[in-house]
Amino acid sequence: MGNSMHSEPSPAIPGIGVHSGQVMTVLGPIPVEDLGVTLTHEHILSDVGCNGPEPPEASRKALFHKPLTMDILGEVRLLPQCNRDNQRLTDLDLVVSEVEKYCHWGGRTIVEMTLDGAGRVPLGLKMVSHRTDVQIVMGAGYYIEFSHPPHVRTMSADDIADEIVRDLTEGVPGTGVGAGIIGEIGIDMDFTAEEEKSLRGAARAARRTQVPMSIHVPGGSTRSHEYRTRIMDILEEEGASLEHVIMDHVQIHPTSMESQMAIAERGAFLGYDGISSGFDWGERGMGPGDEESAADIKHLIEAGYLHHILLSHDVHLKIMLTAYGGWGYAYILRQFVKRLRAHGVTDQDITTMLVENPKRLFSSRYQRGNGFGNP
């Protein structure tokens, strides 16, 4: 996998990366200044069956294969992976309706983290963007090993890097749709050799293109802090800049406040991307409620980490859509900002997290530095 240390980033590829002043969307590049209100971790069209394989028990198989209907919603909320249909976001008209609600509440951009092997549909995302006027930034790379297409096992880290660079610079083959972020690169409970290979390939692509990264770390694991530390060490070893990396799912137990601060101290962004999930993750542990997340965000702001916080919902299941009784993509704008204000978070702080920090993620022109200077 290589152990070389890179002290300097590669020269920028013209037109992309954090020095370009642009962000690639599924409809083409836009100025960073035009991002507007941005959710930095969502799924619009996806199929995350990798998170829930068919159960071995005959008694559970019927529920697993049943269409998601009102009579089983309660059961599915207790364990979202127990139903296969719940894990599919494939109805174009449905997701257009859901994304339109986000646009109605002032949302401008969504960073879409679905990857090859987990249901990425580049042309579908292009259609959603056309129909909703919401800017969509598509991801590149590979999620957790269980989702990897078979050919990934035969690839080297450099092969993976080349493929990601192609998606970023030329577009996904056969679609002409370009990716604008690397991720969400998946690390699961066991942090397998294949996942490390994928991570190193992604980091090398980030070094070559200077395009931001987003890294999935399993919530509910007692090893989350250990894994995040190891991930950041690998990224730095491969020459990726942590100042343009999101460490996802930091609010999910048992990630401590000390662990979150340690991530920010190394320069990375804190992905508060489970706002309003509203269900129990079963054996992986219960995510914090919005009240706890709001209090933690206020604590981080008071400790000086405002410019490291990004907000999102991580919508990836049908039960998270408003059509199935969920809160959808507009919940942060409709409700969670009120909870933040109740904790003393100012409107300027909210704008920083939803507008200015995404600009910092995608552009080196917006400085954090000592004291977190204003853009």
Language model segments and positions:
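Divalent metal-coordination and catalytic microenvironments
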Residues: 41, 110, 142, 206, ...
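Mid-to-C-terminal alpha-helical segments outside catalytic/metal-binding sites
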Residues: 17-29, 331-375
